[in-house]
């Protein structure tokens, strides 16, 4: 029944099947009738679907625009806070660069070599002052009571500066020695080996030294070594050495 109704209703307006049943003259008249052609296009399903999609996109864009406008104050506040942070960062970077420059100047001024030069200058100044005080005392321009305390302070200061300069020089020498690279193995001199490690045993030992005076032989008979024929003899018993007796004088 539904199929029969659809067949009686005919094709949908704007569908290719509806234009296919029209004659050439009707199609020409339809092309010349723009309002009717526009109405046919608007009644087509494809156009209505595109219209619905357009309305949905417009509604979505409108919602996003409202949300963006609501977040705009927060964006402006964030930009202002970011600008403040950048300004603070710039000030911190400038302060850091200034402090680094002052630190480098201080390190150069108070380096060990500069401190050594300052100590040597102080030592020379203290010794020069002591010599001037001695000359004033010898010329009678200064009394002994005023000379002794000042001279003692000057000599103590000179001794302190000399000790500090010597200790600092020793420290600098140690640092320079530790900074020098270790010598390579190629520069090491060849090691000398003992003759016993190179020559054979007999050649290394050489002939035994003959004592000048031999002790008298023992009069006791030596017991024969025990052993079975065909078997090697066991270790020979060692005799304890007897104290050497002086030889009788020659007659």
UniProtKB/Swiss-Prot annotation:
Q: Do you know which Pfam families this protein is assigned to? A: Mod_r (PF07200)
Q: Which gene encodes it?
A: VPS37D
- Give the record's keywords alphabetically: Endosome, Membrane, Protein transport, Transport, Williams-Beuren syndrome
What is the superkingdom listed in this entry's lineage?
A: Eukaryota
The family database entries (InterPro entries) matched by this protein are listed as: Mod_r
Q: What is its main location?
A: membrane
Give the linked disease.
Answer: VPS37D is located in the Williams-Beuren syndrome (WBS) critical region. WBS results from a hemizygous deletion of several genes on chromosome 7q11.23, thought to arise as a consequence of unequal crossing over between highly homologous low-copy repeat sequences flanking the deleted region.
Its annotated compartments are: Late endosome membrane
Q: Please provide one cellular component term from the Gene Ontology annotations of this protein.
A: ESCRT I complex
The name of this protein is Vacuolar protein sorting-associated protein 37D
Q: Where is this region: Disordered?
A: 174-251
Its function, per the record, reads:
Component of the ESCRT-I complex, a regulator of vesicular trafficking process. Required for the sorting of endocytic ubiquitinated cargos into multivesicular bodies. May be involved in cell growth and differentiation.
């Amino acid at each position: 029944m539904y199929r029969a109704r659809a067949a009686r209703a005919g094709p949908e307006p704007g569908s290719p099947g509806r234009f296919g049943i029209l004659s050439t003259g009707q199609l020409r008249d339809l092309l010349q009738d723009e309002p009717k052609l526009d109405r046919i296009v608007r009644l087509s399903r494809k156009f209505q679907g595109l219209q619905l999609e357009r309305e949905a996109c417009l509604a979505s864009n409108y919602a996003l625009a409202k949300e963006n406008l609501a977040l705009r104050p927060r964006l402006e506040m964030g930009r202002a806070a970011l600008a403040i942070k950048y300004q603070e960062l710039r000030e911190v970077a400038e302060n850091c660069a200034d402090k680094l420059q002052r630190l480098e100047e201080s390190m150069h001024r108070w380096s060990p070599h500069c401190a050594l030069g300052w100590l040597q200058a102080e030592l020379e100044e203290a010794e020069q002052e002591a010599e001037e005080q001695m000359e004033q005392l010898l010329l009678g321009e200064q009394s002994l009571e005023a000379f002794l305390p000042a001279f003692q302070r000057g000599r103590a200061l000179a001794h302190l500066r000399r000790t500090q300069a010597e200790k600092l020089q020793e420290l600098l020498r140690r640092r320079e020695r530790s900074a020098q690279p270790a010598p390579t193995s190629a520069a090491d001199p060849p090691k000398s080996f003992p003759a016993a490690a190179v020559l054979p045993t007999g050649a290394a030992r050489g002939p035994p030294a003959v004592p000048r005076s031999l002790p008298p032989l023992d009069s006791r008979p030596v017991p024969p070594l025990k052993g079975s024929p065909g078997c090697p003899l066991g270790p020979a018993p060692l005799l304890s050495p007897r104290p050497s007796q002086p030889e009788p004088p020659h007659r």
